[in-house]
């Protein structure tokens, strides 16, 4: 059975559904304390810092976006006030009609140049707060499908440091435009548009990415996005592109012609489940420093050709599921692949059901310990060159040739291949004959 999601992370494969990120999740508000309740939220006991509770209190304040709400003063102790870094002492009565389909957003200023930092001992919780026509910055971008906001204009007119999780799971937003972008020192954009499943248009022409180091999951699960032009991106300092476009299942065109990947070390699941992508040009990619490519093209079921002849894989150790479930793939060019440091090729070509020829005579597999299901489901494969396969370190090889043609297996048996591979083929042929 073919998997629906790529299950490969930086540390290997998992049998559970793919969930590469674990940002702060919604939970219920903690029980009311003896200090009482203000604005529907429990107060913190005097002199104590309830780390996780402070998060829920803050979220509760801004959560109800569709009704008239009076936000009253909440008496935080000094320690909590210092940690939250926002002024919550003077709120006015606020009424929101919520009929507008376009909202202009602006980050909330604080001395750290961040949106919010709840507690440094926990994962930093970033969310932008936007202005209404009264300039009261009290609403979050945690928007769901039943909310009416569909278009957002962003104005960044002062320095901020991180956009991590900025629009995380904003499922209702269809269009985002960065109208003004202050030249800044932003270093993080991981999960920035993660889960924006209604997003069809995004204008990044004013984007400044000069100092960004992390773009992991940046467009993950933007399942309605059809086109993406990142021609102006400066990626000189980026080291992590893990799952950057994972789950962009409607994406048919992506321009990466100016991508600088010189410093990238992680490309795992980068194009995972880009199932509508029919062509991808990575001829300018520099992969000299990449160490993991696991699941990089997993589930790219519309790709028919992949040319990676320019790829330098000298430092790559993990190729788990790299081309798994590329079910339309007919041609793949890996002539320059150096696999001398690779230890895991599990699922590497799993489910490549249209692939007819595969020449791997340049593969150095002396350090590979797992080849399980490597060619499983390659049901159209009629030519496979494994003449230089060194299986001396292989510990796992179960399912390696499952669902391959009998003719291919018989042909391989006649070739000069390792005794481990011959034994594996003999066992499989005996099963097929019985």
State the predicted function of each range.
Residues 1-186, 388-390, 402-434:
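N-terminal capping/linker segments that flank leucine-rich repeat
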Residues 10-13, 29-31, 35-37, 210, ...:
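Acidic, Ala/Val/Gly-enriched low-complexity intrinsically disordered segments
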Residues 11-14, 30-32, 36-40, 213, ...:
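Intrinsic disorder/low-complexity segments
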Residues 168, 191-195, 217-221, 243-247, ...:
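Short beta-strand elements of solenoid repeat domains
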């Amino acid at each position: 059975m073919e998997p629906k999601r790529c299950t490969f992370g930086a540390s290997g494969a998992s049998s559970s559904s793919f969930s590469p990120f674990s940002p702060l999740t919604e939970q219920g508000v903690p029980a009311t304390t003896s200090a009482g309740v203000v604005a529907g939220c429990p107060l913190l006991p005097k002199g104590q810092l309830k780390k996780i509770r402070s998060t829920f209190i803050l979220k509760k304040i801004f959560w109800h976006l569709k009704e008239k709400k009076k936000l009253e003063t909440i008496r935080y102790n000094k320690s909590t006030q210092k940690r939250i870094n926002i002024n919550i002492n003077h709120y006015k009565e606020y009424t929101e009609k919520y009929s507008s389909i376009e909202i202009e957003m602006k980050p909330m200023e604080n001395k750290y140049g961040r949106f919010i930092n709840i507690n440094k001992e926990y994962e930093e919780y970033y969310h932008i707060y936007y202005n209404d026509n009264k300039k009261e910055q009290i609403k979050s971008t945690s928007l769901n499908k039943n909310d009416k906001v569909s278009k957002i204009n962003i104005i960044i007119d002062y320095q901020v440091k991180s956009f991590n999780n900025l629009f995380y799971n904003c499922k209702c937003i269809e269009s985002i435009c960065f109208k003004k972008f202050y030249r800044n020192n932003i270093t993080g954009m991981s999960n920035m548009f993660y889960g924006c499943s209604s997003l069809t248009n995004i204008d990044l022409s004013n984007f400044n990415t000069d100092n960004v180091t992390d773009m992991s999951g940046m467009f993950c699960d933007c399942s309605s996005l059809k086109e993406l032009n990142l021609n102006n991106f400066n990626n000189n300092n980026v080291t992590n592109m893990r799952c950057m476009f994972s789950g962009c299942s409607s994406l048919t065109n992506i321009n990466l012609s100016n991508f600088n990947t010189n410093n990238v070390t992680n490309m795992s699941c980068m194009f995972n489940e880009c199932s509508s992508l029919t062509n991808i040009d990575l001829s300018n990619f520099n992969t000299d420093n990449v160490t993991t490519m696991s699941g990089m093209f997993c589930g790219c079921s519309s790709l028919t050709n992949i040319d990676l002849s320019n790829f330098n894989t000298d430092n790559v150790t993990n190729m788990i599921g790299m081309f798994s479930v590329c079910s339309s793939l007919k041609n793949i060019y890996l002539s320059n692949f150096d696999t001398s440091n690779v230890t895991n090729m599990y699922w590497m070509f799993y489910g490549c059901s249209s692939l007819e020829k595969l020449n791997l005579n340049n593969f150095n597999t002396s350090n590979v310990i797992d080849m399980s299901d490597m060619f499983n489901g390659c049901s159209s494969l009629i030519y496979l060159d494994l003449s230089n396969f060194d299986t001396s370190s292989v510990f796992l090889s179960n399912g390696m040739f499952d669902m391959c043609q009998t003719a291919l297996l018989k042909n391989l048996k006649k070739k000069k291949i390792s005794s481990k591979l011959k034994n594996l083929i003999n066992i499989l042929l005996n099963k097929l004959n019985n």
